[in-house]
Amino acid sequence: MREVIFMFDCCSCNQDMNVPAEDSGPRPSVINIEKATLQNSNFRMAIWTGEHLQLTLMRIPAGGEIGLEMHPQLDQFLRIESGTGLVKMGCSRELLSFQSSVSDGCAILVPAGTWHNLINTGSRPIKLYSLYAPPQHPHGTVHKTKAQADAAEAQQDH
């Protein structure tokens, strides 16, 4: 017996959507993620925070970096929309044995407990979006700069 599956696009993504002004989670949402990512001017901005998942936008300036970090209890997915960089990962902060050049269209998958950093090696900002499961940052987080992000994380003991 043959099984036929029909798939329908029940929602259309408004191509004119701008960067969300605030975190819309946990309400149901549809956004143009590529456009929102490219328009983002903040170092980090949480645009949707649910109970088990969080979506953030990031802008890493030329010569900048996310900063070496490790999330013991969550997996992370990053998607580069523009820019070029070098991602480093490993089992300890001293042993980052995995390295790869990344650019537009690359997806970076970071397992829980893995030390990682993304360094901008290009002349323009890296624009990316990141999914955390479970959420990593407080609902509504906006850090205009890496310095603000570092200060907030120091207060939260990340």
Residue ranges and their predicted role:
Residues 35-38, 94, 119-158:
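Double-stranded beta-helix
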Residues 2-54, 67, 100, 104, ...:
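A short, N-terminal "cap"/entry segment at the start of jelly-roll beta-barrel domains
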